[in-house]
Regions:
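ATPase nucleotide-binding head domains, primarily ABC-like/P-loop NTPase cores
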Residues: 39, 235, 305-306, 310, ...
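Active-site phosphate-binding and catalytic loops of NTP-dependent enzymes
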Residues: 93, 116-125, 256, 392-398, ...
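Conserved catalytic alpha/beta cores of large enzymes that bind or transform nucleotide phosphates
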Residues: 170, 175-183, 514-547, 650-653, ...
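Amphipathic heptad-repeat alpha-helical coiled-coil/stalk segments that mediate oligomerization
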Residues: 210-220, 272-276, 288, 379-458, ...
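Terminal-proximal interaction/regulatory segments of ATP-powered molecular machines
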Residues: 477, 843-867
Length: 867
């Protein structure tokens, strides 16, 4: 503070002490009915929240005045939410003692710290998304990566062997906040994911937070299991990351977080891997440009009716399975619901009444729940028996398993409804929340408040009868409280236990012990009732908190049922089929459709297409055709169908047989990375390099216009080299859809046995070009570029001139011809193809056995190659 320390008030010193311990937070300091902010916190809050900045100590010189601003306590959550959304941390400092009964300085302390990754308030969260905080720890070339959504209790940890895997996992969970420390955590790939791709809040950790012994002790104490039981024994990076994250959450929440009851270790081998480019290009959860849910795959598939189901659907989409049996169980459950429309309809109606069990339970455990939340929870519990009944009517083993996992929680619903009034106030400390009949002491206090006048009248009548004083009255004033008034004419009849308090001209005023006790009861009944109701509420809250495990298991089962019901509803509505998942390598799709494009088309039918990929003679599909014809849509369609199938969904096709795919890679579109100063071509090459490094023979590659960011010859050479590498069984042999404008690459079908040409059919009618949107075998030698330019609205004079130039180029033979032979498998490279061929030829020559004439012939061949 600007004020000298010796001149500070006790409250100001108290503020300084608390602020000193929370320097990275904006401190909301409770003063009566307001939360006040001071100094730099006030300046920041005033700017970000559009608050009026004022000062304390206005009588002092300006340089000694303290900037301040404040917000009302009853609307504080909305202000906190705005700051957290902007990336700030907020520390909430509450009054721990009642100012009305406290002599001297009110005790204050931090009750919680709100950060982007630790929010639990419903008004600050998207109910359909998890809100993860992550912890990244690097050591010895490995990375421990832990994720926790404190609002639901979900806690995951994994170990990554390289920065690319870290980036992929960060993309999968999309945390709001990341704590990082250790070797390699600032690698470019990771930092790019954190800052540019995710834009999340990054906290730089310090060594004291990442100690193995402390992490082991904390994890074993919290989860009441040893590391072997937790599944992370010997995995030091995972242990340290998990322990550091849990400690941060405990420090921030000021709570034991008993709803975080399971640490789930997972390996990358359990789920299909999707890097951040694939997630973006396939528009799984949001569109690339508008960043909106509408227009994404999630938008099409999300017919869930519970908040938990919405979050789980997103999770299934982010984590397609690699276990054929588990995938099949999901498909079986969806099929069961597809074939039973009555059950599906009744289940849907029951799910609509289920509240967000996970997040309400978290607010119960963390002490931030209110009575309205509890009544909503009870209504959700009341819907559970019907959910169980409908699942019992199904035949799917998975649906039966979910039914068995659902606890109807009738006892909890009864307790809540028998305790809380039907329409409670929003706050829990102001009374009026406990139902009549729930507690005898509360009822008695309520009777005292409601029947005070009746009690007084009863005492007055009783005293008249006992004393025989007809004029006796019981009255009240602020000086004496309740008193008995007796006229002078009856003074000799006043009982000895009456205590005289006042003498007036015509009467005397007395008090009795009974009246003083009544006064104490009546005057303090409201305050005592309010305190008692809060005590009853906290007892109810603590009882419910002990049911966290029951509620969470039920919530997970309900969420899964909701997702399966959603997928079934979409399958019926859109005419999807059950895919067959195999351990083979082939993808066979009959009449496949793009799920999103089909959904947005209103007056036009989507043109379906077949896909046959992965066989010995059809490993790589080269797709040619004009811009706007639908190449990119088709390739994305195939990738989305594969992903949908492996997440457990039916797919938009007449039939589909899909060999398990471990990774989907995409190289689609072109854009400069201005933030890092990289050109379009550099971005493209970096993505291609990553694909070729991490893809396997089980991967699906979607490659669109490789090489177009550079000159024609360089681009064509690179495109061909990448194609050869992907097709080569010795190098990669991955299933590949390869769209290109380099029509010369169509000759690869004759050179490589597992490459096939396809094109997008186009029909010309006079000067008009009609896109048929149909994939047909064979290559096309015409890009229809000028026709597309005409459709785009290029002026006719420019179009005419372009036709003249094209005729001149074609007459001069200006089209590039690719005449080089296919390089040997061990020669495929991204370098210049001619140079590579010369090197390969030289390496193949055995100089010791070469005759002079053979040497001359070889030299002639090399010279011809260079020409």
């Amino acid at each position: 503070m600007a004020t000298k320390d010796k001149e500070l008030t006790p409250m100001q010193r108290q503020y300084n002490e608390i602020k000193e311990k929370n320097q990275d937070c904006i401190l909301f300091f409770r003063l009566g009915d307001f939360y006040e902010m001071f100094n730099d916190d006030a300046r920041t809050a005033a700017k970000e929240l559009d608050l009026t900045l004022t000062t304390r100590d206005r009588g002092k010189p300006k340089e000694e005045q303290t900037p301040m601003c404040g917000v009302p306590y009853h609307s504080v959550d909305s202000y906190i939410a705005r700051l957290v959304q902007k990336g700030y941390k907020v520390a909430i400092c509450e009054q721990m003692t009642d100012p009305a009964t406290t002599k001297g300085l009110v005790e204050r302390d931090i009750t919680r710290i709100v950060t982007p990754g630790t929010v639990t308030e419903s008004c600050m969260l998207d109910e359909s998304k998890n809100n993860y905080m992550a912890c990244l720890y690097g050591m010895g070339g490995k990375f421990g990566l832990a994720f926790c959504d404190v609002s639901t209790g979900a806690f995951f940890v994994t170990v990554c062997s390289d920065a690319q895997s870290v980036a992929s996992e960060l993309g999968r969970f999309a945390p709001s906040e990341v704590l990082r420390f250790g070797a390699g955590v600032e690698e470019e790939t990771i930092s790019d994911a954190l800052f540019r791709r995710l834009g999340c809040c990054v906290d730089e950790g310090h060594e004291q937070q990442f100690r193995l012994e402390a992490a082991e002790e904390l994890l074993e104490r919290h989860f009441e299991q040893n590391l072997a039981q937790l599944g992370i024994a010997g995995m030091d990076t995972a242990v340290i990351a998990s322990g550091a994250l849990l400690q941060v959450l405990l420090d921030v929440q000021k709570n034991d977080l008993k709803h975080i009851r399971q640490l789930q270790y997972y390996t990358n081998g359990k789920f299909m891997e999707l890097d951040m480019d694939a997630r973006r290009n396939l528009e799984l959860t949001e569109t690339m440009r508008a960043k909106e849910k509408k227009g994404s795959l999630l938008w099409v598939l999300d017919k869930t009716h519970t908040a938990m189901g919405g979050r789980m659907l997103r999770s299934w989409m982010e984590k397609p399975l690699l276990d054929v049996a588990e995938i099949s169980r999901r498909h079986g459950a969806v099929e069961d619901l597809v074939e039973n429309p009555i059950v599906r309809g009744e289940l849907t109606e029951a799910l609509k009444d289920v509240s967000d069990l996970e997040r309400v339970m978290t607010r119960i455990v963390t002490g931030t729940v209110n009575c309205r939340d509890l009544l909503g929870l009870a209504r959700g519990f009341r819907a559970l028996p019907e959910v169980k009944t409908q699942l019992q009517n199904c035949e799917s083993p998975l649906l039966h398993k979910l039914e068995a996992a659902i606890d109807p929680l009738t006892d909890c619903a009864d307790l809540i409804e028998n305790t809380i009034v039907d329409d409670p106030p929003l706050t829990v400390r102001e009374g009026g929340i406990i139902r009549k009949g729930a507690n005898a002491d509360a009822d008695r206090l309520r009777d005292i408040m409601d029947g005070g006048k009746d009690i007084i009248a009863s005492i007055e009548a009783s005293e008249k009868e006992k004393t025989g004083i007809r004029t006796l009255k019981v009255s009240f004033n602020r000086v004496f409280g309740y008193y008995i008034e007796v006229s002078k004419s009856f003074m000799d009849q006043v009982p000895g236990h009456y205590i005289r308090k006042q003498t007036l001209a015509n009467c005397e005023r007395y008090i009795t012990q009974e009246l003083k006790e009544l006064e104490e009861q009546v005057l303090t009944a409201k305050d005592r009732l309010t305190a008692l109701e809060y005590q009853i509420f906290t007892q109810l809250r603590e009882h419910l908190a002990r049911q966290a495990a029951r509620v969470q298991l039920t919530a997970s089962a309900v969420a899964s049922a909701d997702v399966l019901c959603s997928l079934a509803s979409v399958a019926v509505q859109r005419g999807y089929c059950r895919p067959e998942i195999t351990l083979g390598r082939e993808i066979h799709i009959e009449n496949g459709r793009h799920p999103v494009v089909e959904a947005v088309l209103k007056d036009t039918l989507f043109v379906p297409n077949d896909t046959n990929l992965g066989s010995d003679d059809n490993q790589v599909a080269i797709i040619t055709g004009p811009n706007m014809a639908g190449k990119s849509t088709y390739m994305r369609q195939v990738a989305l169908i594969v992903l949908m199938a492996q997440m457990g969904s039916f797919v938009p096709a007449r039939s589909a047989k899909i060999g398990l795919v471990d990774r989907v890679f995409t190289r689609i579109g072109a854009s400069d990375d201005l933030a890092s100063g990289q050109s379009t071509f550099m971005v493209e090459m970096a993505e291609v390099a990553s694909i070729l490094k991490y893809a396997t023979s089980r991967s699906l590659l979607i490659l669109d216009e490789i090489g177009r960011g550079t000159s024609t010859y360089d681009g064509m050479a690179i495109a061909r080299a990448v194609l050869e590498y992907a097709a080569s069984p010795k190098r990669l042999g991955a299933k590949t859809l390869f769209a290109t404008h380099y029509h010369e690459l169509s000759t690869m079908e004759q050179r490589l046995p597992n490459v096939k040409n396809y094109n997008i059919a186009v029909k010309k009618r006079g000067d008009q070009m009609i896109f048929l949107r149909k994939i047909v075998p064979g290559a096309t030698d015409d890009s229809y570029g000028i026709e597309v330019a005409k459709l785009a609205g290029i002026p006719n004079t420019v179009i005419s001139r372009a036709r003249e130039i094209l005729e001149e180029l074609e007459a001069e033979g200006g089209r590039v011809q690719m005449v080089a032979e296919v390089a040997a498998d061990d020669q495929v490279s991204m370098m210049d193809l001619t140079g590579q061929q010369v090197i390969a030829a030289l390496e193949a020559i055995t100089v010791e056995t070469l005759t002079p004439i053979e040497a001359m012939n070889e030299l002639y061949k090399l010279k011809k190659m260079l020409q």
